Amino acid sequence: MEIDVSSFKKIASILYATTLLAGVMTASFAQAQDEALKGDGKELVMFTITASNVYGANQIKGAQAEADRLGYKLQVFQNNFSQPEQDQQVQQYIASGAKPAAVIFWPWVADAAINDVRQLARLAPVVQLTQEPNEQSWPFVQAYSGANQILIGETLGHTLIKARDAAKAAGKIFKSEGGNLLIFQHPEGEKTGTERLKGFEAVTKDAPFNIIHLEYGANSPESGYEIGSQVIPKYKDQIDFLFISNQQAANGIIRALKENGLTPGKDVYLVSGDCSGSLEAVKNGETFGTGIQPAAVEGALAIRTAAKLVKHGKVEGDIVQMEVSAEAPPIEDTPPAKFNYMPHAPAIGADGVANTKIWG
């Protein structure tokens, strides 16, 4: 059988040209979508936590990069985990006479920040960040953008179940039927922790852990170590598993565990809610697993949500849950949903950290 090589070359050339054209068209479409949402120098204002915290720093960095890309000027106010400080910042900003195109607002204590969001809503549409609005604040908030805290809690629960299975396989004898669980929660009153605990309880209800204590306040390596040093000595003979607010806090608690004679990953198994902070302990097995929640992605998504709101002046639909993808997807030139959730994925061990990429 004689093969016409020239025909194959022609077909290959056509396929290559078609693929190249599709790529160019996709890139052009994405660029057109971005152009449609350009800010043209309009101002956005963002109220969030301090950049001295690694999560706050990365969230601000992601927001600033996306604002620059879309042509918005971004002014950022940082509070040091203090609602009174944030209240003062809001009052000063309002008194300045500023007229932003939109407000991005992370209330430190949601229930105590109702007056802030009420007054900010008189200036511009409000996008609430990280902590979902409650019934009192929804009349003044147009959209939520950020982490899906229930999903994070569910992911934490599923990962703790895997940790329990791994502990059983390693021959660990539990101190109660389902294993004793010590919880280090976010600061009391922060809705982030409340929602995550709801998600955790929902996915573990059929095979529950025995919660021996819940301690509020661990949210950084320093507070994790300080609080852990006080709590762990009281419960060190009772602990099988630890549920920890985030990896920053876990890194401090690991230090406290070691100082009290407990080896993480052997005597006790830890799971953290999100990946803020150094992930070395996840890679070396001292933390069994965490959730990949890049703060920079949360900041970028908040800017995208605000840009959509500025362009269209309304929300459309209830929920958009962003899928996990290695690269940031193009922005759709549509109104934002009421709830705009960033991607989230579990990561167990070094391979989990290495192989889970979200928006770069």
Q: Residues of each region from the PLM?
A:
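Hinge/cleft segment of the Venus flytrap/periplasmic-binding protein
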Residues: Q33-K42, E177-E188, T204, G299-G360
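Beta-alpha junction/loop-to-helix N-cap segments that form part of ligand/metal-binding clefts
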Residues: N80-E135, Q142-A147, Q247-N251
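Hinge/beta->alpha junction and helix N-cap segments in small-molecule ligand-binding domains
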Residues: M46-K61, Q75-Q88, V109, T130-Q131, ...
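Short, low-complexity disordered leader/linker segments with a strong preference
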Residues: M1-E43, D68-R69, A98, R118-L123, ...
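Flexible loop/hinge segments that line or gate small-molecule binding clefts
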Residues: D116-L151, K162, A167, I173-N180, ...
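Short, hydrophobic alpha-helical segments
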Residues: L70, I94, L160-D165, I232, ...
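Exported/periplasmic ABC-transporter solute-binding proteins
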Residues: I244, R255-D333, H344
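Hydrophobic alpha-helical
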Residues: A102-R122, V126, F200, H213-A281
